[in-house]
C-alpha cells in the first residue's frame, strides 16, 4: 500500500515516523515550505520535512497545493493508494482528494464535530473542555466534515498545557492511524461508498457534540486581559503555551506557568479572601512578591500566582527572578 503523507509541525512528524517504522511504504511527503523561525529568524525546514529526510522519503513543499499544478501532476503520477493528512495547514482541493485509490484520510485532534478547523487543541484548553481526542475521518471538500472511522478520547487534566496535551494526542493519533490503515487496506477494489460502509464510518451529524470552529490563533489572542476571571486567564496561559504574555513598561513578559491562588470550590474563608481582594485591588495589580512562592496578580475574581515566566530578551525563569529582572514592585500594574 503506497502512502503519501501530508503534514507540517512536530505533532505530524511523530505520526510520520510511527507509520514509516511500522513498515508502511511512504512514497512521498508533502509539507509547507521552509520558514524563518526562532530568535535569529533563520530559514528552517518544517519538522515533517526533517523527519522525511531522516527516513529518505522524497519531499515536496508547497505554499498552496490548490495553485501548484506541478506538484499536483507529480502526485498524480505517483499513483498512491492512500493520502494521510495530519496538521498539513492547507485545505486540499477536490482534484487532490480524488487522486488516491483507497481514499484521503485525516487525523484530526478533536472529538468531531467539536472544534473543526486549524487550532483544535488550543481551543479545547482555552474553553476548559473536560475532554478531547482524535478522530480519523474520510476527507471531503468541507472543513473537517467527513465521516469518522475511528475515535479515541482523553481527559484534559488541570495541569495540561498545549505542549503536554499535544504530545499525548500525537501518540494517540499515531496509534489510531495504524489501526485505521490495517482496516483501509482491506477495502481494495471497493468504491468510496462501499469502502465507508465496510469501515463502519459514522456521519458527523450522528456523533455527539455541537459543531464548532477552532479558528487559527492570532498574535492578538496571546495578550492576557487581567480584567477576565482567573480561570479564563489560566486556561489561556495553558492553551497558548508558551506564547501568552502580558506587558510591563512596554516590554513583553510571557507567562509560562501559573495557578489560581484561591478557587471557588474552596471554603468560605477563600470566598472572604476573594471579596477582600476585589475590594482592595485592581485587575493586573501585583500584590505579593515572594522568593519561595512567586508573584501574585489580581484578576476580576481570584488572584493568579505566577510561577514561571520569561521577560522579553531573557531566558525563562522563576517569577521571583523575573521580578528582579523587570524591577517589579508591589502595587505595580501589569498589562501596560
From Swiss-Prot:
Keyword entries, A-Z: Protein biosynthesis, Transferase
Binding residue positions for (6S)-5,6,7,8-tetrahydrofolate: 110-113
CDD domains linked to this entry: FMT_core_Met-tRNA-FMT_N, Met_tRNA_FMT_C
GO molecular function, one term: methionyl-tRNA formyltransferase activity
Entry's transmembrane regions: none
Pfam families the UniProt entry points to: Formyl_trans_C, Formyl_trans_N
Gene Ontology CC annotations of this record: cytosol
Family, similarity comment: Belongs to the Fmt family.
Function of the protein: Attaches a formyl group to the free amino group of methionyl-tRNA(fMet). The formyl group appears to play a dual role in the initiator identity of N-formylmethionyl-tRNA by promoting its recognition by IF2 and preventing the misappropriation of this tRNA by the elongation apparatus.
HAMAP family the UniProt entry points to: Formyl_trans
Protein name as catalogued: Methionyl-tRNA formyltransferase
Source organism: Prochlorococcus marinus (strain NATL2A)
Gene: fmt
